[in-house]
Every structure is written in C-alpha cells, then in structure tokens.
C-alpha cells in the first residue's frame, strides 16, 4: 500500500468526522439543547477515534522518515496538499510536520497559511502573479506553477478589494478568494492611502516584533495563549510599513520613485547573520489555527494617521527599500530595467525594489514611459543581500502582473506594496 493511498485514506477518515460534526451543527437550529449535548458527545467520540487510530500511534522514527520523504517528493502544488493533509490528521502528525516542514526562508516553499507572513527564500525568489478584476475592484495573488508567464493556472494565495472613500482609498486583504471583508475570519490586513495616493500605510492584524514601537490598545493586557485569533485583545490594525511615492513637481514624464519603510523588519536583517524577528502570537498558534475554524472578531483600529509610529531612542532602525532607478536608452527613447523576461509590457507601474543603502540616483534625460526591455549585460558576480532585487512587479498582459519576491519580505508584505501601484497618483506622474 503506497503512502499516498494511506494519506488519502486518513484524509477521507478525517473528512468523514468533519461532515458528521457539520451535520450535528446543522441540527442545532431545531432542537438546541438536545443537539448541543449530542454535538459535544459526537465531538468527543471523534477525538477518541482519531486518538486511538493506528495512524496516530505510528512509531515516531517511522513517522519522521515518512514525513521527510513526503516533504521532499511533494515539493510543488497541487501535490503539496498531501503534506497539508498529513498535518491535519492529529496533533502528533501536526507536530511532526511543524518540525520537518521548513519556512519559506529556508525551503523556498509555501505550504501552510502561516507561510504568507514569513520571509521569502534567501537564495532564490518566489514567483507569483496578480490578476486584476476592474469591474469588482478586486485583486488576486497566485503562486506561479509554470514558468510560462501567461499561463493562468496557479495556487491561490491572497485577495484584496479596493474601496474608495472621500479622502482615502483602502485595500482589504484576505486569505479567501471570495469573502473579502474586515469582518471575515480570513482578514489579515489592509493598505490605506492618503487623498493624493502618494502615501500608503500597510496594516497587519498581528503586532510586529517591535510592537512596543507601534501604537497599542490602551488599558488592555496582551495574552498569547488562547486558541482564538486574539484572546483578550481583538484583532487590530498595526502599522508595519509605509510606502511613499515621491512627488513629481516639475510635471515631466518618467518612472515613479517609491520609498518603503518596513517597520516590522530591522535594517540588520540584510546583514550577514541577520534575521527577521517573527510575530510571537501569530507564529505560536499558526499551524494549529490552520486546521481550526476561526471565528470572526471585533476590529480595533489603533493605527493613527499617516504619521510614523512612536519610536524611542536606541531602537533598531527599520529596513528602508527604494526603487531601482532605470537606465534611459536614447535610441529607444524609453526607460529600461532588467526583469529577466518576467515582465513584457511597458508600464509606469513596473518597478524593482532593493535596499536603499545601495540605490544610487539614476541619470538620463526625461523621456517616455518606463519600458521593461531587458538589458543585455554580462553575468554579475555573486551579490550581497543589499545588492539583490527584493521585489519586482510588472505587467505581462491585460490585467495580469507578475510579482516576484525574496527575503526579507513576506508574500503579504510584497502583495500590499504591489497594490499601492494600482492606485491613482495625482502628483507623481
């Protein structure tokens, strides 16, 4: 009996338990008291069955070897869902998966929902694409499963919906493709702009590593041991990044210039041996919550206006990212950036982000729109983290854009930054 058939057997068994629990919950609407007690008994019975099943009692050494082989063999989606299915069998299997399956920073793979808020790979990039729906003002982020840019088959990751207000624009970001709202249990953050569309704040529902620097809920204690999204403190809006587009006061045509201050990432993260501190609450419950039904919670906004979070002297400086200045090609009369074939359509939205410590002011005359024609240059020697492109975004077709990111950005952060380029900018171009 192959291991994949075993996984399917276990998954079907767990699925039957879930369906039984669902049937019990549905019956609650008619006979509340009786159904409630019956539902508890059925739930306990299911837990006992799972706990006593032969799958939960496999020897640890055997289970570890099997999980390792599965993690190595099922390395891409959709086959990767077998690893997720194993983590949902029981607590023993879940803990084993948590120990074996590495974060994207070291594996380069997106496996569990928590991976969307973990830094990308250090030695590679994660290739994604964004599909825009102008009629519904929605944006969907997918993991690229094929090298072909225009192939519209991918693993869904995140979605966003734009809402225009009188003085600002807001993008709500969710892990659900259809239910995109702040009241949903899949809501994980938002992007908010000012009136001109030149400044954006990225808000996360979980505090960053330096949450003491970020405006926190007043007169409330914070506990991280509950099984809910937020035990005593409702999920809030924590300022983790600020995106600013430089004003174009002269009115000349040219590429946009963007600055990103990543409050949740220290500048030392790009130094040798540097790391991105994790969110204690979020990562502590992440894998368990991936397999539980998360109830919606009240939203508390303690984000403030477009001002920098309060910082004390001696605190770690945040990472600052800037757009890489393109080269002006006089024969083509266009701006040029090397996207290595990942961007094919010239657009003012196209950009590449790298550490501000290495960005030098570009030179050249004013000209047309930003082109994406790759420049032919000899292979460069190995780059340091400061010299590498951390995020690049560009157009490949009608309402289709590629988004590739790497360490230290996460998929959530890269998606939020990319969303800012879709907004109308009255004074930047």
Swiss-Prot record:
Gene3D superfamilies: Tubby Protein, Chain A
Region (Disordered): 360-385
F-box domain mapped to chain residues: 53-108
Gene Ontology biological process terms from the UniProt entry: regulation of DNA-templated transcription; response to fungus
Taxonomy, superkingdom: Eukaryota
InterPro entries per record: Tubby-like_C, Tubby_C, Tubby_C_CS
CDD domains (alphabetical): F-box_AtTLP-like
PROSITE patterns recorded: TUB_1 (PS01200)
Expression by tissue: Mostly expressed in roots, flowers and siliques.
Polar residues composition bias: residue spans: 374-383
Pfam families attached to this UniProt entry: Tub
PANTHER family for the chain: TUBBY-LIKE F-BOX PROTEIN 5, TUBBY-RELATED
Family: Belongs to the TUB family.
Protein name: Tubby-like F-box protein 5
Organism: Arabidopsis thaliana (Mouse-ear cress)
Gene: TULP5
